[in-house]
Amino acid sequence: MHTIINTLRGRFVHGKDESEYYESIIKNVHTGMDHTFCFSVCNTELPEIPPGTIVFSTSDEHHRQPIPNHLQENVGILLKTFFPKEGVTDHRVLPFPLGYFTDFGGHALTPIAERGLDYSFYGAHNDNGRDKLHGWLRKRKGDGCKKEWGFYEGWGKGKGMWDYGSLLTKTKIALCPPGYVSPECARLPEAARCGCVLLVPNDLPTHLWYFQGFPGIKIEDWSNLKIVDELLADPKRMQDISDETVKWYNRCIDPKAVGAWLTERIKERIQKA
């Protein structure tokens, strides 16, 4: 039986962390051996861990290099979300996808044509493209579309995860602007899980393994989203993109797929040892 050391749960006052996603991945790791896994925030020193521990490092939206403590000799593999843009020389450090936060209940069972919202956005306000999106949304107030959007100040102060999942489940087009610093944010994989058509930053690190075959539509200027009207005028195109989005999610983000990927990475390390 695998051992999990979870330093995330209860750490954040808003209660949002990736524990459920990581635990679901670990359930799908089958190497024929038992392993120790540790969940940690990127800038927090690890607790005492046994040799070969597999560490999930999160919350480093600045894409920084791992801190020395996360590269200690007892770390077998370091799975790093927000992978450093310049790469990492330590072969134990692997790029890892953002998944979904605990209690996110969104799903892709509703066909695009039956969804009640043409487009939606709900998230924290920042000046990394979201200010332009805010302006565009305000101009679209009377556009005749069914929509729901809102901005709030500070991270983690918006909708509860279950309500947020419900919002994305009934959304056709999910607006996924950059996070505070990074072009990556959890909204992207969460909306993909719901089969939304994704409008995303044009500088996503699509060279990383988990973006292989990514069907999101890249946006350069968040103040000019004429693509929204083009998509809404072509329901078949939207459904086709939705289908490809679900396939990508199931192949690259779903815990079963990521668990299988991680199983192979662990086996490779064992063979090299």
Please report, for each region that a protein language model flagged, where it lies by residue:
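A short, well-ordered alpha-helix in the C-terminal region of glycosyltransferases
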Residues: E230, R237-R251
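C-terminal "capping" alpha-helix adjacent to the active site of nucleotide-linked donor transferases
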Residues: E220-R237
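Nucleotide-sugar donor-binding catalytic core of glycosyltransferases
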Residues: M1-I217, R251-K272
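Generic signal for short, ordered secondary-structure residues
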Residues: T169-T171, N224, T245
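Alpha-helical protein-protein interaction elements
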Residues: A113, G156, A233, D240-I241
